[in-house]
Amino acid sequence: ITLNLYAYLASWGMLRNSFLMQKDYLFSKPVVKILCKDKYSNLISFNPFKENIITDLETIMSLRDEIKEYYMGQTYIEDGTNKTKTISNVTDTLITKIILGTLGCVPAYDQYFVKALRRNKINGVFNLNSMKQIIQYAKDNKEEIEKACNKLGNLYTPMKIIDMYFWEVGIEK
């Protein structure tokens, strides 16, 4: 699973200019262990349309914090300088790409997605407030999102559909 995660991140350009480029795939093995914890197992069937979703959103925020905590403070050798560096910044983009690619319960907060959120007056920082706003957007557009899921053979989660939609909006000039 760790190798699959590494390949997935590489395919989305997440290794480029990143501390991950200086590590092999086993560096993220503890992240896979975090993702596989029982307390996060319900996120694999995350339903943004259900009522009383706050507990699920708080669980997602807990997962975010655990992933970030693992990476923060780890060291790597800086390319070209052979200096040991300490990881001091773990981006929302990296964390959300990991969660989207494994559990499918959040969109990926990359530059185009965030740009589209802001155009729609939605908070562009991966936090509880932003997720609440995205969930409200999902509920307001439930019919269209479910139609897209069905059209794509239910291969994508509702949050992946939201991710793709906002990414397309964000990339437009």
Regions found by a protein language model. Give the residues of each.
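Cytochrome P450 catalytic-core helices
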Residues: I95-K97
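An N-terminal alpha-helical hairpin/helix-loop-helix interaction module that forms a charged
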Residues: I1-T86, G104-K173
